Amino acid sequence: MDYIRWIAMGWMLSCTLVNAWAQPAMFKGADLKLGEQLIAEHKCSACHTRRVGGDGSDIYNPQGRINTPGFLRGMVEQCNTELNLGMFPEDVNAVAAVLNRNHYKFK
């Protein structure tokens, strides 16, 4: 019986890990390292900290504000346009994928 229990626990753990790393289809193949680099390079946290105070993380919290992967990508594109960051579409996607992985967790 212990053998079956171990198999079941292993299966549940593997499903949990796969879901933890799952990304929506629009973020599949996004370069997460590039996204992290761009977030640091463009000082996204500093701007968001000025806008919402504290450490800036409250920008991710308003319920229902960003409720789909497409809307998240659109918000990153809006920052890109308004701040004239010059990011290419794949850059915007990479930044949105990192934000999704770290904060929103859309599947």
Describe each region flagged by the PLM.
Residues 42:
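Cys/His-enriched microdomains
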Residues 32-37, 45-81:
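Gly/Gly-Pro-rich "capping" loops immediately C-terminal to redox-active cysteine motifs
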Residues 29, 66, 70, 86-90:
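Soluble non-cytosolic domains of exported or imported proteins
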Residues 1-29, 106-107:
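N-terminal export/targeting leaders of redox proteins
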Residues 85-107:
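C-terminal capping alpha-helices of c-type cytochrome domains
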Residues 19-39, 81-84:
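Electrostatic cytochrome c docking/interface patches
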